[in-house]
Protein backbone atom coordinates (compact mmCIF):
# COMPACT_ATOMS: atom_id res chain seq x y z
CA UNK A 1 0.00 0.00 0.00
CA UNK A 2 1.41 3.39 -0.98
CA UNK A 3 0.85 6.31 1.36
CA UNK A 4 -1.83 8.59 -0.04
CA UNK A 5 -4.48 10.85 1.40
CA UNK A 6 -7.38 9.00 -0.20
CA UNK A 7 -8.66 5.49 -0.58
CA UNK A 8 -11.46 3.61 -2.27
CA UNK A 9 -13.37 1.26 0.01
CA UNK A 10 -14.31 -1.28 -2.65
CA UNK A 11 -17.51 -3.25 -2.22
CA UNK A 12 -19.33 -5.91 -4.21
CA UNK A 13 -22.71 -4.93 -5.66
CA UNK A 14 -24.43 -7.62 -3.61
CA UNK A 15 -22.87 -6.60 -0.27
CA UNK A 16 -25.84 -6.74 2.09
CA UNK A 17 -24.39 -4.81 5.04
CA UNK A 18 -22.68 -1.58 4.03
CA UNK A 19 -22.57 -0.19 7.56
CA UNK A 20 -18.77 -0.30 7.90
CA UNK A 21 -18.25 3.30 6.71
CA UNK A 22 -20.86 4.65 9.10
CA UNK A 23 -19.39 2.63 11.95
CA UNK A 24 -15.90 3.87 11.08
CA UNK A 25 -17.08 7.50 11.10
CA UNK A 26 -18.74 6.93 14.49
CA UNK A 27 -15.50 5.46 15.88
CA UNK A 28 -13.48 8.40 14.60
CA UNK A 29 -15.87 10.99 16.03
CA UNK A 30 -15.80 9.20 19.40
CA UNK A 31 -12.00 9.54 19.32
CA UNK A 32 -12.26 13.29 18.75
CA UNK A 33 -11.53 13.24 15.02
CA UNK A 34 -13.32 15.93 12.99
CA UNK A 35 -15.23 13.92 10.39
CA UNK A 36 -17.09 15.35 7.42
CA UNK A 37 -18.87 13.70 4.54
CA UNK A 38 -22.00 11.77 3.76
CA UNK A 39 -23.34 8.30 4.40
CA UNK A 40 -26.26 6.71 2.56
CA UNK A 41 -29.06 5.20 4.58
CA UNK A 42 -31.47 2.84 2.83
CA UNK A 43 -35.00 3.16 4.18
CA UNK A 44 -37.22 0.08 4.28
CA UNK A 45 -40.84 -0.63 5.07
CA UNK A 46 -42.05 -3.22 7.57
CA UNK A 47 -41.69 -5.94 4.91
CA UNK A 48 -38.06 -5.02 4.23
CA UNK A 49 -38.74 -3.41 0.84
CA UNK A 50 -36.75 -0.32 -0.01
CA UNK A 51 -38.77 2.88 0.28
CA UNK A 52 -35.97 5.36 -0.29
CA UNK A 53 -32.42 6.48 0.30
CA UNK A 54 -31.27 9.39 2.43
CA UNK A 55 -27.86 11.00 2.46
CA UNK A 56 -26.85 11.82 6.03
CA UNK A 57 -24.30 14.57 6.69
CA UNK A 58 -21.78 13.21 9.19
CA UNK A 59 -21.08 16.57 10.84
CA UNK A 60 -24.67 17.76 11.36
CA UNK A 61 -26.87 14.68 11.00
CA UNK A 62 -28.91 16.49 8.33
CA UNK A 63 -30.87 14.04 6.20
CA UNK A 64 -31.37 14.67 2.50
CA UNK A 65 -33.92 12.50 0.69
CA UNK A 66 -32.15 11.67 -2.58
CA UNK A 67 -34.31 8.76 -3.66
CA UNK A 68 -38.01 8.05 -3.16
CA UNK A 69 -39.02 5.47 -5.76
CA UNK A 70 -42.61 5.32 -6.91
CA UNK A 71 -44.41 2.04 -7.41
CA UNK A 72 -43.72 2.41 -11.14
CA UNK A 73 -39.99 2.97 -10.52
CA UNK A 74 -39.86 -0.21 -8.45
CA UNK A 75 -41.87 -2.27 -10.94
CA UNK A 76 -39.89 -1.06 -13.96
CA UNK A 77 -36.55 -0.89 -12.13
CA UNK A 78 -36.04 2.70 -13.28
CA UNK A 79 -33.93 5.30 -11.56
CA UNK A 80 -35.69 7.54 -9.07
CA UNK A 81 -32.71 9.61 -7.95
CA UNK A 82 -33.65 13.21 -7.16
CA UNK A 83 -30.71 15.01 -8.74
CA UNK A 84 -31.68 18.35 -7.18
CA UNK A 85 -31.57 16.74 -3.72
CA UNK A 86 -28.20 15.23 -4.63
CA UNK A 87 -27.03 18.73 -5.54
CA UNK A 88 -28.20 19.91 -2.10
CA UNK A 89 -26.02 17.24 -0.49
CA UNK A 90 -22.88 18.76 -2.02
CA UNK A 91 -22.98 21.44 0.68
CA UNK A 92 -21.91 18.86 3.29
CA UNK A 93 -18.75 18.14 1.29
CA UNK A 94 -18.06 21.78 0.52
CA UNK A 95 -18.42 22.57 4.23
CA UNK A 96 -16.01 19.75 5.16
CA UNK A 97 -13.45 21.09 2.69
CA UNK A 98 -13.95 24.70 3.81
CA UNK A 99 -13.58 23.75 7.49
CA UNK A 100 -10.56 21.53 6.83
CA UNK A 101 -11.90 18.48 8.65
CA UNK A 102 -9.51 15.70 9.65
CA UNK A 103 -11.12 13.18 7.28
CA UNK A 104 -14.00 12.94 4.82
CA UNK A 105 -15.97 9.70 4.72
CA UNK A 106 -18.20 9.38 1.67
CA UNK A 107 -20.57 6.64 0.66
CA UNK A 108 -21.24 7.87 -2.85
CA UNK A 109 -19.54 7.01 -6.12
CA UNK A 110 -22.71 6.12 -7.94
CA UNK A 111 -23.96 6.57 -11.46
CA UNK A 112 -23.92 10.38 -11.33
CA UNK A 113 -20.33 10.52 -10.06
CA UNK A 114 -19.28 7.91 -12.59
CA UNK A 115 -20.60 10.27 -15.29
CA UNK A 116 -18.56 13.13 -13.82
CA UNK A 117 -21.63 14.70 -12.22
CA UNK A 118 -23.20 14.55 -8.76
CA UNK A 119 -20.55 14.93 -6.05
CA UNK A 120 -17.65 14.54 -8.49
CA UNK A 121 -16.33 18.12 -8.24
CA UNK A 122 -16.35 18.03 -4.44
CA UNK A 123 -14.61 14.64 -4.38
CA UNK A 124 -11.81 15.94 -6.60
CA UNK A 125 -11.59 19.16 -4.55
CA UNK A 126 -11.09 17.14 -1.34
CA UNK A 127 -8.31 15.17 -3.02
CA UNK A 128 -6.70 18.39 -4.30
CA UNK A 129 -6.82 19.88 -0.80
CA UNK A 130 -5.17 16.69 0.52
CA UNK A 131 -7.92 16.11 3.04
CA UNK A 132 -7.95 12.39 3.84
CA UNK A 133 -10.87 10.85 1.94
CA UNK A 134 -12.34 7.39 2.31
CA UNK A 135 -14.90 6.79 -0.42
CA UNK A 136 -17.10 3.77 -1.11
CA UNK A 137 -16.60 2.57 -4.68
CA UNK A 138 -18.52 -0.33 -6.22
CA UNK A 139 -16.26 -3.07 -7.53
CA UNK A 140 -17.54 -2.69 -11.10
CA UNK A 141 -16.57 1.03 -11.09
CA UNK A 142 -13.09 0.61 -9.59
CA UNK A 143 -11.28 0.99 -12.93
CA UNK A 144 -13.16 4.23 -13.61
CA UNK A 145 -12.40 5.50 -10.09
CA UNK A 146 -8.71 4.74 -10.60
CA UNK A 147 -8.73 6.52 -13.94
CA UNK A 148 -10.40 9.60 -12.41
CA UNK A 149 -8.07 9.66 -9.42
CA UNK A 150 -4.93 9.03 -11.45
CA UNK A 151 -4.60 5.60 -9.82
CA UNK A 152 -2.85 7.41 -6.96
CA UNK A 153 -5.12 6.36 -4.11
CA UNK A 154 -5.22 3.17 -2.13
CA UNK A 155 -7.83 0.46 -2.62
CA UNK A 156 -9.15 -1.13 0.56
CA UNK A 157 -11.49 -3.95 1.39
CA UNK A 158 -14.87 -2.68 2.59
CA UNK A 159 -14.07 -3.57 6.17
CA UNK A 160 -13.21 -1.80 9.42
CA UNK A 161 -10.05 -3.90 9.69
CA UNK A 162 -8.84 -2.32 6.44
CA UNK A 163 -9.99 1.24 7.26
CA UNK A 164 -8.30 1.49 10.66
CA UNK A 165 -4.68 0.85 9.58
CA UNK A 166 -5.12 3.07 6.50
CA UNK A 167 -6.31 5.92 8.73
CA UNK A 168 -3.11 5.58 10.74
CA UNK A 169 -1.07 6.35 7.60
CA UNK A 170 -2.81 9.61 6.66
CA UNK A 171 -2.94 13.00 8.28
CA UNK A 172 -4.48 16.21 7.03
CA UNK A 173 -2.04 18.95 6.16
What are these regions (language model features)?
Residues 24-72:
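N-terminal phosphate/diphosphate-binding loop that engages ATP/GTP or pyrophosphate donors
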Residues 58-99:
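Helix-adjacent hinge/juxtasegments
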Amino acid sequence: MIETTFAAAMYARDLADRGALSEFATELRAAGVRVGGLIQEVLRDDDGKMTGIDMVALDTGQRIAINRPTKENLENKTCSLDTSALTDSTEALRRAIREGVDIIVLEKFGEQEQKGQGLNDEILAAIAEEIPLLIAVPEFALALWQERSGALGDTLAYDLDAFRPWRGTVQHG
